Amino acid sequence: MIGLIQRVERASVCVEGKEIGAIDRGLLVFVGIERADSAQQAEKLAQKLLNYRVFEDELGKMNLNVQQIGGELLLVSQFTLAANTQKGNRPSFDPAMAPQEAEPLFDYFCQTVHTHYPHTATGRFGADMRVHLINDGPVTFWLHV
C-alpha cells in the first residue's frame, strides 16, 4: 500500500463540480492499493501516516506529526500510484488491486485513520475527482508499506 503525502495549507476534492471533502492545514494523502495489500498494510500505513513527523517544531525541525499540530487529513484513492513504469512509454496497472477488491480496503483504511484521528475527510473511490491544494513547502513523501 502506498501513501503519497503532501503537507498542505489547505486542500479540497470535488466530484461533478461539488466539493465533497476539504481540509485546512494538514496532509493530503493519495492512496494506491497494490494486489497483495490487506488490512495489515492498511493499519500499518494508517499508523505511519498519523505519526510521521513532517511539521516543523519551534526550532524549524520536522519533528511534529499531524496530530501534534491539530492538523487535518484528506484521503484520496489513486490507483495510478501502483503503476509499473519500468518498461516502455505507457504505465502498466497490473500491480494495482482490482477496483472491486480495492474499494473495501480503501474504506477500511479511511475508517482506521478516522477512528484514531477524526479530523479526516475523503474523496470518492473510483470517481473522476478534481483535487485542489496549496502545498506547504512543498513537502512530499512516498510511504510504502
From Swiss-Prot:
Lineage: Bacteria, Pseudomonadati, Pseudomonadota, Gammaproteobacteria, Cardiobacteriales
SUPFAM superfamilies reported for this sequence: DTD-like (SSF69500)
Organism domain of life: Bacteria
GO biological process terms, semicolon-separated: D-amino acid catabolic process
Enzyme kind, highest EC tier: hydrolase
Pfam families assigned to the protein according to its UniProt record, in alphabetical order: Tyr_Deacylase
InterPro entries: Daa-tRNA_deacyls_DTD (IPR003732), DTD-like_sf (IPR023509)
Homology family: Belongs to the DTD family.
Cellular location(s): Cytoplasm
Short motif (Gly-cisPro motif, important for rejection of L-amino acids): ranges: 137-138
Catalytic activity: glycyl-tRNA(Ala) + H2O = tRNA(Ala) + glycine + H(+); a D-aminoacyl-tRNA + H2O = a tRNA + a D-alpha-amino acid + H(+)
Alphabetical list of PANTHER family matching this protein: D-AMINOACYL-TRNA DEACYLASE 1, D-TYROSYL-TRNA TYR DEACYLASE
Cited function: An aminoacyl-tRNA editing enzyme that deacylates mischarged D-aminoacyl-tRNAs. Also deacylates mischarged glycyl-tRNA(Ala), protecting cells against glycine mischarging by AlaRS. Acts via tRNA-based rather than protein-based catalysis; rejects L-amino acids rather than detecting D-amino acids in the active site. By recycling D-aminoacyl-tRNA to D-amino acids and free tRNA molecules, this enzyme counteracts the toxicity associated with the formation of D-aminoacyl-tRNA entities in vivo and helps enforce protein L-homochirality.
Subunit details: Homodimer.
UniProt keyword list: Cytoplasm, Hydrolase, RNA-binding, tRNA-binding
Domain note: A Gly-cisPro motif from one monomer fits into the active site of the other monomer to allow specific chiral rejection of L-amino acids.
Its EC number(s): 3.1.1.96
Record's GO cellular component terms: cytoplasm
Protein name: D-aminoacyl-tRNA deacylase
Name of the gene this protein is made from: dtd
Molecular functions per Gene Ontology: D-tyrosyl-tRNA(Tyr) deacylase activity; Gly-tRNA(Ala) deacylase activity; Ser(Gly)-tRNA(Ala) hydrolase activity; tRNA binding
